[in-house]
Design a protein with these regions (language model features):
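Mid-domain, small-residue-enriched loop/turn segments at the edges of structured enzyme/sensor domains
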Residues: 2-14, 46-88
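Preference for short coil/turn "hinge" residues that link or interrupt alpha-helices
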Residues: 23, 35-38, 65-67, 74-77, ...
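Solvent-exposed loop/turn segments at secondary-structure junctions
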Residues: 24, 35-37, 48, 61, ...
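Structural recognition of the beta-strand scaffold that forms the well-ordered cores
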Residues: 28-31, 38-42, 53, 62-64, ...
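A generic secondary-structure signal for well-formed alpha-helical elements
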Residues: 45, 49, 54-58, 62, ...
Length: 172
């Protein structure tokens, strides 16, 4: 029901909550973890299309109740997602757009070199390579100068290692 309250709000550095609905720059919104832009995008692109993309392309295990705007745009999912499920979804952007379930063991060979086990080789194109490249740049910017700067890593020789990340806020 309509309450007249602006939604969703964003945590602000001053410690309170604020509404930032006029901003339309996705690059900056992701960098600063603004909730309003995903909500606007969800409305614009269509919640069913986003739900289908999340479940079919990224392999997220969502329930029917998650087809609403709050779950899809700000992550207020009915049951949440497991860390493995989330890793699988984000791996798409590090795999050139291909989805594959995370695995630790890719193959096992016997002492004489005979293949005993081979796994984790099913890959599906989830997004095109250009999209995965753009998403990587967006997520790297979150670490470079956004809300995840604490995750920056510098090698012993001073080289800055590119890290992609995403932060979120919750009251739970």
């Amino acid at each position: 029901p309509a309450t007249g309250k602006l939604w969703p709000t964003n945590y602000s550095s001053g410690g309170g909550m604020s509404y930032t609905g006029s901003m339309k720059n996705v690059y900056y919104a992701l960098q600063k973890s603004y909730n309003t832009i995903p909500a606007l995008l969800c409305k614009e692109l269509g919640r069913i299309e986003i739900y289908n993309f999340a479940t079919n392309n990224l392999g997220l295990e969502l329930v029917q109740n998650d087809q609403d705007y709050a779950p899809l745009s700000v992550g207020a999912l009915t049951y949440g997602v497991s860390i493995t499920n989330l890793v699988n979804a984000y791996m798409v952007y590090g795999n050139g757009g291909y989805y594959s379930k995370a695995h630790i063991i890719s193959k096992v060979e016997s002492g004489d070199g005979t293949l005993v086990y081979s796994g984790g080789t099913d890959y599906n194109q989830a997004v095109d390579e250009e999209t995965s490249t753009v998403m990587n740049k967006l997520l790297q910017n979150v670490v470079k100068q956004g809300t995840a700067t604490a995750a920056k890593i510098t090698a012993s020789d001073g080289t800055k290692i590119p890290i992609a990340g995403k932060t979120g806020t919750t009251s739970d």
